[in-house]
């Protein structure tokens, strides 16, 4: 099986998790980045930009990803929870995966430990692209838990 890691990270918490995991797996890694970067000021990013995108279902333009996604059996998708679901650049990424035939395993992390956020994310991802097989991965787990889970994919 050939696996790819795709992630979004603003504060680098998710980036650090992905880097820790990839010392074990050595998968190809792609970062989803908003075309116009979010403010580096937390309050502006969280309470203005990200909140507006979620409330208005805005999927912002993202930087081009030069990847043949169908050359991978599975995509491991990592992101933080923003406003009870995934960050909207992830929505853009999922929208743009027109003909992906593999599985997308979803991994989310959040400051709060409410499992409803993972449920929201899975529901919202599936509503954006009904042709993709989204598989619930882990929510707010340790690097070791992630490694053990990913080894079974």
Positions of predicted regions on the chain:
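Short, glycine-/small-residue-rich phosphate/pyrophosphate-handling segment
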Residues: 105-142
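Acidic catalytic loop of the alpha/beta-hydrolase fold
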Residues: 83-84, 113
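Short, conserved loop/helix-junction motifs that constitute active-site signature segments
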Residues: 69-70, 95-103, 114, 129
């Amino acid at each position: 099986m050939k696996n790819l890691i795709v992630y979004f990270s603003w504060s680098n918490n998710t980036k650090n998790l992905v880097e820790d995991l990839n010392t074990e797996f050595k998968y190809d890694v792609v970062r989803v980045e908003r075309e116009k970067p979010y403010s580096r000021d937390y309050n502006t990013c969280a309470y203005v930009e990200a909140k507006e995108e979620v409330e208005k279902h805005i999927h912002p333009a993202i930087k081009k990803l030069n990847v043949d996604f169908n050359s991978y059996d599975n995509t491991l998708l990592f992101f933080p929870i923003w406003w009870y679901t995934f960050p909207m650049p992830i929505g853009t990424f999922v929208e743009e995966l027109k003909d992906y035939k593999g599985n997308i395993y979803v991994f989310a992390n959040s400051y709060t430990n409410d499992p409803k956020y993972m449920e929201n994310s899975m529901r919202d991802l599936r509503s954006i692209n009904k042709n993709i097989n989204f598989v619930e991965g882990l929510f707010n787990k340790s690097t070791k838990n992630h490694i053990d889970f990913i080894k079974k994919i």
